[in-house]
Structures are given as structure tokens and as C-alpha cells.
Amino acid sequence: MTHSDLSPVQVRVRALESALVAGGHVDPAALDALVETYETQVGPHLGARVVARAWVDPEFKERLLADARIAALELGLDPGPSPVVVAVENTALVHHIVVCTLCSCYPRALLGPPPAWYKSLPYRSRAVSDPRGVLKEFGVELGDDVELRVLDSTADIRYLVIPRRPEGTAGLDEDELAALVTRDSMIGVAEPLAPASAAA
């Protein structure tokens, strides 16, 4: 990527990085290690692995619902520094949506950095005052018979939503199922992808 291919924000980030390295404030190797960690060892692909395992292994799902930290560790995943990570399951009768009303508390190790909309004041306030309206804006319309639970993530407790497994996925293996799980579905503002959507 040449300098001319960079966006103005990328140019500023590169300039800031260069200044910090030149001034001895940042170790380039440590910075590279941090980037490598975020690219390979944290992110929504890890949360998707947890969800896919829960979809195919009822005993694992029970352990996940009982203690998400321990269940994630079973898969060799570090759920991050939050003392408590709670997994909740969306069903035909109950749907969960996660918000942090104070800032942007979020299970980064399993879902990666939070999306900009998750940190925005409109989402943080409307997810509490008008959660069905927010879901509708994301393309999720719940029936009147579905109980909607809004979960407030904090510094002490983070949430991972286990979305409903899509229909038509009985023959898929765990990796194929994980490809259907999106970050937004693990926050509760979207459904997982349909098998045809993931293949496209």
C-alpha cells in the first residue's frame, strides 16, 4: 500500500506511529505484536466458534450458559479481562439485545473491537427506551409474543448472545456454522446468516 492509497485517517495514524516510535515512546515490535493479536487472537471469529460449538453440543451449551469464561477456556480461548462473561440464549420466545449504557463495555476478546454504533449515544439510549425500534432498524422484527430482554454490559459483566441456529443447517459442520455467526448476532441486533448468504 503506497502513501497515495491511504485515507486521510490512515495517513495521520501512520504519522503518529512514526513520531511515537522515533521518540522512543513505542516499541515497534510491541506494536506489531498488538496488531497481530487483534488480527488473529481476538475478534468475532472466536465468539462464532463458541456459538457454533453450543449449536452442535448440548452439554457444551449447558456449560456455556452456566459459566461462559470456563466454556471459552475449554476451547482454548481467553475470554478477556472481564471478571464475568455471561452467555444468554435467544429462543423462539426470548430475544436478548446487549448495550452498555455508560460507555462501551464489550467482550472484546470474543467479539473484537466494538462497532462505532455500539458506542454511540443514540444506540446506548434507544436500546433501552425503544429496543424493538432499534432492532427493526437493524432488520430484526420480533413478534409480539417474543419477550425482549435488554442486557446492560458493565465493567464487571459482559454478555455474549447465542443466536438461534438458522434453519437448514442440520448437515453443516462447526466451521460452516461458525461462518454464519456475525458479531451483530452475538450482540443481539441481528440474526445469523442463512446458509446461502454465507456461501455468496
Language-model segment annotations:
Residues M1-A200:
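Terminal, compositionally biased segments used for targeting/anchoring and flexible tails
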